[in-house]
Amino acid sequence: MKTKDLREKSVEELKALLDEQQLNQFRLRMAKATGQLGKSHEVQVARKTIARIKTLLTEKQGNGQ
């Protein structure tokens, strides 16, 4: 997901998206560990998306200064 798209979301939407992405990352890691994941780069993409969301949450909550 692009940062531009994430910036348009509210704090509540970002928190919900963060929960969803963390669950997705967990599922991807389990699939990778059991050898069922065909596209191993998806784990890295999920991790970077989570980092983007956390960064934007920090900025929007006023702690980024």
UniProtKB/Swiss-Prot annotation:
One of its GO terms (molecular function) is structural constituent of ribosome. This is Large ribosomal subunit protein uL29. The gene is rpmC. PANTHER family: 60S RIBOSOMAL PROTEIN L35/50S RIBOSOMAL PROTEIN L29, LARGE RIBOSOMAL SUBUNIT PROTEIN UL29C. Belongs to the universal ribosomal protein uL29 family. Gene3D superfamilies: 1.10.287.310. The keyword Transferase does not apply. GO terms for cellular component: cytosolic large ribosomal subunit. The lineage of its organism: Bacteria, Pseudomonadati, Pseudomonadota, Gammaproteobacteria, Moraxellales. HAMAP family: Ribosomal_uL29 (MF_00374). It comes from the Bacteria. The keyword Membrane does not apply. Pfam families: Ribosomal_L29. Keywords: Ribonucleoprotein, Ribosomal protein. GO terms for biological process: translation.
